[in-house]
């Protein structure tokens, strides 16, 4: 709620409310305060205008909103499917490089709003686990959603996803390891060599073969 903040910012809250929407102002100031964290050289902070409870409340709502907009919350529009073309491109490039048999590195730059749904579409564990009931939790009780998925762990500043491929000389078996923000992670695919996965199994999982999933 924005009542406390409005009283801090305005001498006459009643008059201010005629021109200012309290919740919208609170959210906008929160976004500015968050952006300041990306510019430590300025030495500025706005988080002190909020209480810890307010910061947590706004963050849980923002977390749920990001997940719902990406389609990760069960029952929401599956917007993450828009990133299927990106995942398919990653797969085709990997297959081409494997065929060519030469060491290679491919980079793709994007925004956090694209990295989040792509991480879900790949199957990274940090994006999984929201129960079906979370659709209602995300809409009416967003405080619950972060207990399952937290965007801070997926798309911090400079967030990134890496697929690292390995092949033993003379072998056709390609292994792949997944990294999220430089940390090893996993996908719901059976493997006998964790944290590595057989590339053929990963592709089958992406194609929707349920038998290969854990």
Where are these regions (language model features)?
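Signature for phosphate-centric chemistry
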Residues: 1-214
